[in-house]
């Protein structure tokens, strides 16, 4: 079953390779969507894929790459848009 979630991640997640880390894992898991930095230091992402794959990616995002320190994650289900890839929005 395909699900879609919007995730807002807070903590030390900018300047540590967090978007690249998430993109690499998303593509490996077959998750589609996007990720971007937010003003103020957080990161926002939309994840679309099989429930198991999205759940696994959320776990990886909670850990983050070395140098990151995730202090919070807000997760909400959203309408699926049929993304065809996972990309970083600049």
Curated annotation (Swiss-Prot):
UniProt xrefs under Gene3D superfamilies: 3.30.70.100
Coiled coil residues, start to end: none
EC number(s) stated in the UniProt entry for this protein: 3.6.1.7
Keywords, sorted A to Z: Hydrolase
Record has Nucleotide-binding as a keyword: no
PANTHER family: ACYLPHOSPHATASE
Name of protein: Acylphosphatase
Organism of this sequence: Methanothrix thermoacetophila (strain DSM 6194 / JCM 14653 / NBRC 101360 / PT) (Methanosaeta thermophila)
């Amino acid at each position: 079953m395909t699900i879609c979630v919007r995730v807002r991640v807070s903590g030390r997640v900018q300047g540590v390779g967090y978007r690249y880390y998430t993109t690499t894992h998303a593509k490996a898991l077959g998750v589609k969507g996007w990720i971007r930095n937010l003003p103020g230091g957080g990161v926002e992402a939309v994840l679309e894929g099989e429930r198991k794959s999205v759940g696994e990616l959320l776990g990886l995002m909670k850990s983050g790459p070395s140098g990151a320190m995730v202090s919070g994650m807000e997760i909400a289900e959203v309408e699926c848009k049929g993304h065809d890839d996972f990309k970083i929005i600049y």
